[in-house]
């Protein structure tokens, strides 16, 4: 055992130095070689133990033979002595049985030795086989592994190239399939069109004269309908242009007539056209009305003329501001503040009512400034209006009857 341990230590010291890092294939080979070496060492150790046992058995057999001879001699002496003493004599059969037992024991020992020798021979054969395998793997590690690694890399490159070629071929086949499908579809459509034309030609050949004339007339009517539709569209466009020009001309004429009549713009917008005055003009002219209403505290003669002039202006403002409820509330607040202004407001509203009735007569009389010079003032009773009246006036101004129409414009001309 000590010799085997020393031999293993020498093998470990005498072996080549280990590398720091090895590839997987070489590491596997080293691992397998180590396993084989360990197995060989175990077998060698078993062989040595068996040899030692064999030597021990040989020594024991020799010792047993010597003991056997000694016992035989001793038995013979005892027999001789027993015979001499008159003891029972050992017969030959007893001796033979004893000898047979010893022979059987020796035979068993010999069989055991043979078995041990057979095991030793088998172990030696295995040891030789393992040594041959070890040499083979060492040669493969030194020479064949590099060659196989090169083969593996070349095969991997071949596989990659085959995959790339397969992908390119598949893409090419897809493109060719799409092109062929498109070509087939185009050819089928062309063939269908040709067959339709041939069918129509054959049908026309077989058609009677009456039906042929009907078909020809139908085509002619379709063409005429298309031409008629184009003409209708052109006429509609021309009509729209003429209507726009007419509206422009009517607007110009109305503006010219209004300038000739000298009617204020807000009066026309509120009474004739039924429109609303923008809030900017309202806010600009409201303070003027308050100033004029404050100037009513004067003598009676001047008061009458001022009232009429202020009545015309207030009619314009009242009609222009009737669309908003806030102006009505503002007028009511002024009534509560000044009792003298209530008389002027009632007269102004009465005159407004009269102007609405006789609007056409005022227009036919001529300029509005000359008409106002002939107005005389009169004292009238005060009529307090209810709160619902301005709402009714607001509704009346916005009614469809108050809007301007073609007949109204014709009356101005």
Curated annotation (Swiss-Prot):
<protein>
    <recommendedName>
        <fullName>Coiled-coil domain-containing protein 83</fullName>
    </recommendedName>
</protein>
<feature type="coiled-coil region">
    <location>
        <begin position="37"/>
        <end position="184"/>
    </location>
</feature>
<feature type="compositionally biased region" description="Basic and acidic residues">
    <location>
        <begin position="8"/>
        <end position="21"/>
    </location>
</feature>
<feature type="coiled-coil region">
    <location>
        <begin position="216"/>
        <end position="256"/>
    </location>
</feature>
<dbReference type="InterPro" id="IPR026702">
    <property type="entry name" value="CCDC83"/>
</dbReference>
<feature type="region of interest" description="Disordered">
    <location>
        <begin position="1"/>
        <end position="21"/>
    </location>
</feature>
<keyword id="KW-0175">Coiled coil</keyword>
């Amino acid at each position: 055992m000590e010799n085997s341990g020393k031999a293993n230590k020498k093998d470990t010291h005498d072996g080549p130095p280990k590398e720091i890092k090895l590839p997987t294939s070489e590491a596997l080979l080293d691992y397998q070689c180590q396993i084989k070496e360990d197995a060989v060492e175990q077998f060698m150790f078993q062989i040595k133990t068996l040899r030692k046992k064999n030597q021990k058995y040989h020594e024991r057999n020799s010792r047993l033979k010597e003991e056997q001879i000694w016992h035989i001699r001793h038995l013979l002496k005892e027999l001789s002595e027993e015979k001499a003493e008159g003891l029972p004599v050992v017969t030959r059969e007893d001796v033979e049985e004893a000898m047979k037992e010893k022979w059987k024991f020796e035979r068993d020992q010999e069989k055991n030795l043979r078995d041990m020798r057979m095991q030793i021979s088998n172990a030696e054969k295995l040891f030789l086989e393992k040594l041959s395998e070890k040499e083979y793997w060492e040669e493969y590690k030194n020479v064949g592994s590099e060659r196989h690694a090169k083969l593996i890399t070349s095969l991997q490159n071949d596989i990659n190239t085959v995959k790339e070629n397969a992908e390119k071929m598949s893409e090419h086949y897809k493109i060719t399939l799409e092109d062929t499908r498109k070509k087939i579809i185009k050819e089928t459509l062309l063939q269908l069109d040709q067959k339709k034309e041939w069918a129509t030609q054959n049908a026309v050949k077989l058609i009677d004269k009456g039906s042929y004339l009907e078909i020809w007339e139908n085509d002619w009517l379709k063409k005429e309908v298309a031409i008629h539709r184009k003409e209708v569209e052109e006429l509609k466009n021309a009509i729209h242009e003429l209507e726009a020009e007419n509206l422009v001309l009517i607007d110009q004429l109305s503006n010219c007539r209004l300038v000739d009549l000298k009617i204020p713009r807000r009066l026309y917008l509120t009474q004739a056209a039924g429109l609303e005055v923008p809030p900017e003009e309202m806010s600009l002219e409201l303070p003027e009305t308050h100033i004029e209403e404050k100037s009513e505290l004067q003598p009676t003669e001047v008061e009458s003329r001022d009232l009429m002039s202020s009545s015309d202006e207030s009619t314009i403002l009242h009609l222009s501001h009737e669309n908003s409820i806030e102006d009505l509330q503002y007028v009511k607040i002024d009534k509560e503040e000044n009792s003298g202004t209530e008389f002027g407001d009632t007269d102004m509203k009465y005159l407004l009512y009269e102007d609405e009735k006789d609007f056409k007569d005022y227009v036919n009389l001529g300029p509005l400034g000359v008409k106002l010079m002939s107005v005389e003032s009169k004292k009238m009773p005060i009529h307090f209006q209810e709160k619902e009246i301005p709402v009714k006036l607001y509704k009346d101004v916005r009614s469809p009857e108050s809007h301007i129409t073609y007949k109204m414009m014709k009356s101005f001309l």
